Curated annotation (Swiss-Prot):
EC class: lyase
UniProt family annotation: Belongs to the mannonate dehydratase family.
Descriptive protein name: Mannonate dehydratase
Organism: Cutibacterium acnes (strain DSM 16379 / KPA171202) (Propionibacterium acnes)
Family annotation (SUPFAM superfamilies): Xylose isomerase-like
Length: 357
């Protein structure tokens, strides 16, 4: 297991590499280069510069998140072959600079969705919050405007250029069966997995967030049965999973420790995002601290499953609360995620030492 920390780059992330380097137990980052438009090839020069900055700070850069999949691939348009070719070249360039895992998603239109970005807790901290009932009567356009207006920082998956043609894109997904989206996904995997196998990269698909359908858009990555279908689409270790405890765990029907054990034993868990959520009702939750008792997930059981079944995976704390007056990108503060790492590392040490006696 390698503990990492997500970093968006010096241009847009208020958290510095020096900050990250000072968190105990962090080996490296899960990187992002969100300034590159979706569908474009990531150049060797840009990747080299990014990785060099990370390495010069004394950190590893072996995982990249969000090499986003162009909407034309998800829709199955003829132009998808152009974007798949760009994607393969990007993978080759990433591998040449030591990248071993790429975390991505196959969510149409929205990468993730919350109804509040700064929900105030009783202790004065703020957190990400979701209430499905609040979507009633709202349009996707309403949600996009409210989300973008709520943050002074760029949001991953909510890049304005991606959402510029929202009406047109939404219309193309209307009445699309889940099986059709899954077939388009198979086409994408069949196009990239040979390159992954050649260069030694493992793809790690991130679950739908939250773990159910929204606005009638087909979604195919939010349950154990969905994950089983995905690993069966292309039977290769290069076609692996990123098990996000908070995304899958937003639906209490998903047994996150069991999912980690099942796919870890298959060798198909390349990465894990570890965070806690607090259930507040049906399809209603807030993102709590990482401490088990603050939320509804058993973080010890999750870490034990990673320890016993996914020991060759990269993990990171996921979203955190805004505490101690910190401001920044919603869900990605320094202080609460650093606390999360300390807690997760404490669990890991306890599990390691308990198994030795």
């Amino acid at each position: 297991m390698k503990m990492t920390f997500r970093w968006y780059g010096a241009e847009t992330d208020p958290i510095t590499l020096e900050n990250i380097r000072q968190i105990p137990g962090v080996s490296g980052i899960m990187g992002a280069m969100d300034w590159i438009p979706v569908g474009e090839m990531w150049s060797d020069e840009e990747i080299s510069s990014y990785v060099r900055k990370v390495n010069d700070a004394g950190l590893e850069c072996e995982v990249i998140e969000s090499v986003n999949v162009h909407e034309d691939i998800k829709l199955g348009k003829p132009s998808r072959d152009i974007y798949i070719a760009n994607y393969c070249k990007t993978l080759e360039n990433l591998a040449a600079h030591g990248i071993k895992v790429v975390v991505y998603n196959f969510m149409p239109v929205f990468d993730w969705l919350r109804t509040e970005l700064f929900h105030r807790n009783e202790d004065g901290s703020t957190c990400l919050y979701y209430d499905h009932e609040e979507l009633v009567g709202l349009t996707p356009q309403d949600i996009v405007k409210a989300t973008l207006d709520s943050s002074a920082f760029p949001l991953p998956g909510w890049e304005p250029e991606r959402l510029a043609d929202l009406d047109e894109v939404m219309a193309q997904y209307t009445d699309m069966p889940r099986d059709q989206l899954r077939n388009n996904y198979r086409y994408f995997l069949e196009g990239i997995v040979p390159t992954c196998e050649k260069v030694g990269i493992r793809m790690a698909v991130h679950p739908d967030d939250p773990a159910w359908g929204i606005f009638g858009i087909p979604r195919i990555v939010h349950s154990d049965s969905d994950l089983q279908r995905i690993v069966d689409l292309v039977n290769s270790p290069a076609n692996s999973l990123c098990v996000c405890a908070g995304s899958l765990g937003s639906n209490p029907d998903n047994d996150v420790p069991a999912i980690l054990a099942k796919y870890g034993d298959m060798g198909r868990v390349a990465a894990a995002h570890v965070r806690n959520v607090k259930f507040l009702g049906s399809k209603k939750f807030k993102e709590a601290s990482h401490l088990s008792s603050d939320g509804s997930l058993d973080m010890y059981a999750i870490m034990k499953s990673i320890h016993d079944h996914c020991s060759n995976s990269y993990i990171r704390p996921d979203h955190g609360r805004m505490i101690w007056g910190e401001t920044g990108r919603p869900g990605y503060p320094l202080y609460d995620r650093a606390l999360g790492i300390t807690y997760l590392n404490g669990l890991w040490e306890a599990i390691e030492k308990a198994s030795a006696y």
